[in-house]
């Protein structure tokens, strides 16, 4: 099983040219969770994408947007698991340019 830090690091690196199956496996998610929470599609649809080597860029803009929102929530969750609940203060500090 992957540790939270490894998953978090991978989640920050996800690009549109990554394969759907690779993303799911590297995020250590089940087909059910990834299909439902990541894209709001059935497992059958997810399996079709994976079996036909779909990349994130092959999906509709709406599907990619939903996935990006899911990924953002997932990274926040893992960040809090690793570094604690003061994530809002840290984000505020780094958001000022």
Predicted regions mapped to residue ranges:
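A short, Lys/Arg-rich alpha-helix, primarily the initiator
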Residues: 2-27
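Short alpha-helical DNA-recognition segment
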Residues: 28-48
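DNA major-groove recognition helix of helix-turn-helix/homeodomain DNA-binding modules
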Residues: 1, 5, 33, 59-80
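Short, charged recognition helix plus adjacent turn
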Residues: 7-10, 76-97
């Amino acid at each position: 099983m992957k540790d939270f830090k490894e998953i978090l690091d991978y989640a920050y690196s996800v690009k549109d040219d990554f394969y759907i199956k690779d993303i799911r496996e590297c995020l250590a998610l089940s087909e059910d969770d990834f299909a439902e929470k990541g894209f709001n599609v059935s497992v059958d649809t997810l399996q079709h994408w994976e079996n036909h080597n779909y990349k994130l860029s092959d999906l509709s803009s709406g599907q990619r947007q939903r996935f990006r929102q899911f990924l953002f929530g997932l990274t926040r969750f893992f960040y809090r698991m690793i570094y604690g609940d003061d994530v809002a203060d840290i984000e505020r500090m780094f958001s000022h340019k």
